[in-house]
Amino acid sequence: MPFGEYQYSLDDKGRVVIPAPFRDFVEDGLVLTRGMEGCLYVFPLDRWKKIEEQLVNLPLTDAEARAFVRFFYSGAHKTRMDSASRVLIPPPLRLFAGLKEGGEVVIAGAPGRLEIWSQERWWKAIEEVLAKPPAPEALKGLVG
């Protein structure tokens, strides 16, 4: 599982370098899509196939399920790292995540995925957790 956080700049073509510790995780291809809290999720292809299997089984009669699938699946973009370990982030996904050419980007590991954040949104998300940390009971059995 990928973990850690790394800062890079988005180049003038909308590309970002995948950090060396994460490259093996996505070496066979990846899918970029909209994530929660205004970030992008990056899934390796094998993980994405499992997610697709779960999405196809969501009930069409459930409006919330349809809305989530629309949000999550319609924004998906399959790609690969180039020879310099960069990934092109399509303009609609850059817009969604608030990523600007030349701007600072945080790439963070998470269980089963990577997350790509604008630096500003990343620190806002971290500050929100610090301002209102989860109750110890919610973490029972997970930490410690």
UniProtKB/Swiss-Prot annotation:
InterPro entries: MraZ, MraZ_C, MraZ_dom, MraZ_N, MraZ_sf, SpoVT-AbrB_dom, SpoVT-AbrB_sf. GO terms for biological process: negative regulation of DNA-templated transcription initiation. It comes from the Bacteria. It is found in: Cytoplasm, Nucleoid. Residues 5-47, 76-121 form the SpoVT-AbrB domain. Forms oligomers. This is Transcriptional regulator MraZ. It comes from Thermus thermophilus (strain ATCC 27634 / DSM 579 / HB8).
